[in-house]
Amino acid sequence: MSDTNEILELYYLAQKYKLEGREILDKYSFEDLAKIFNGIGPDAFPSWLRCVISKLHPSLAPVALIHDCEWHESDRTYDSFTESNERFKRNGAIVAKGMYSFFNPRRYIVKNQAYRFGCYCEHLGWHAWCTPCECPICKEARAKEKHG
């Protein structure tokens, strides 16, 4: 879980770079976004590993925030699964272009990493897309349903 200051910064960056799908962020409060956002990496990874990956790839954090919200709202269809992963790749390229100049090698590193992460999600994430969300909001809702 992230703090609201980090989420505010990521929200700002998503707006600044006009990332695809950024409208999904407006559905939630910053507190809820902080509960939904788990950093870069799947829920199955331990939090320390997601933290390390996120620290190594900070420019992809606003892309991952949108992606996490899409996965939070998963409709469990293959079309939306594919679109979410393709959007991650496109948004990563947008961020890379916006943050780094043409001659800066980091531009191409970030773009490549976004593409790779999107491919990992495509090839390894279908099961997670089809299972219930594990964010604190969804866990609380399931607990309330269970206990009436």
Feature map (PLM): residue ranges:
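Extended terminal accessory/targeting regions
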Residues: 1-148
